Amino acid sequence: VKVIPITTPSGTFKVWTKRFGNNPRLRVLLLHGGPAMTHEYFECFENFLGPEGIEFIYYDQLGSAYSDQPKDDSLWVTERFVEEVEQVRIALGLGRDNFYLYGQSWGGLLAIEYALKYPQNLKGLIVSNMMSSVPAYAEYAEKVLMPAMDPAVLAEVKAIEARKDYANPRYMELLLPSHYQQ
């Protein structure tokens, strides 16, 4: 486990990382969904990537799981998260010759934004379960994800979103069973 200090406009905070495997030629930094999800749903990768000799790094973004949880809404912007990923990359010694970035869902958008700003630092980019356009994703959510939800659950989710009450624990209680299998 390596805890990395991250400098932000609101001060210095710590983010949690954990390396699995050892392959100086092939290192994959995992960007989880959310924001504010956790690395834990990537733990199944130990059964697949590890035996293939692929080194990968779990990483809880600021505001997630084992990392610091600042109460400053100004930190929750994509550009700041991109700079956070760059600080993590530097602290872990990842470079163009060995650094692959894997992003899933929100982490996919973050990975794309990182690659657009810092293409010189990457050997490869992997985007999973995400479109490269927020408007396209919003349309997909409206046409595919929402109709699959229980109407009462969807109504409660939309009410929470209308209030912009995303920190409400009920919000994740409603969304997780609708979008993730047990």
Task: Place the predicted regions along the sequence by residue.
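Conserved HGGG/HGGXW glycine-rich cap/lid loop of the alpha/beta-hydrolase fold
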Residues: T7-Q69, S74, R89
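Structured loop/turn residues at beta-strand edges in well-structured enzyme cores
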Residues: N23, E52, E83, L94-D97, ...
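Serine-hydrolase catalytic machinery in alpha/beta-hydrolase-like enzymes
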Residues: A65-D73, K143, I160, Y171
